[in-house]
Amino acid sequence: MFKKVTILIFFFLIFFVSFEDLYSKDEYFLTLRNEKVNLRQGPSFDYPVKILYKKKFLPVLIQDSSDNFRKIRDHENNSGWVHISQLSKKKAAIVIEEELILFGKSTIFSNPVALLKEGRLVKISKCKIKWCKVKTGKYNGWVSKNGLWGLL
């Protein structure tokens, strides 16, 4: 009897519960919508401001939600709460390597276009498996995904 119940539970788990759901954190990236965005200590306008961000399109990792607020974490591990009106679905990333080469095509054998320094904000047009097409300032090109923070 015990063996039958165990087998039944096992099949129930396989067919009705997704293993991805068991392990996923449901974290995703958005960007800051405005030039100035307040990061608060809690999920309400009643909480004090911890940090005033002054960088539009800064990528942030969404970790939790509460009504109209989202708990975020930035590339420097600062975390707090931001109102949803201050967030955008536009794709951007921060260069996290000391230097990252911007190439003309999505291969290391193409011509280098520019050398991007750590902390540089790039807007993302599209991504392939290992490369992203980005724009920063007057430069367009491809960079390795490994050198960017703001992508899953």
Feature annotation, model-predicted:
Residues 43-47:
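Second-shell loop/turn segments in exported
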Residues 1-9:
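Bacterial N-terminal signal peptides that target proteins for export
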Residues 21-41, 51-56, 63-138, 145-152:
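SH3-family beta-barrel domains
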Residues 2, 19-22:
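Extended hydrophobic/Leu-rich segments
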Residues 8-17:
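Bacterial N-terminal signal peptides
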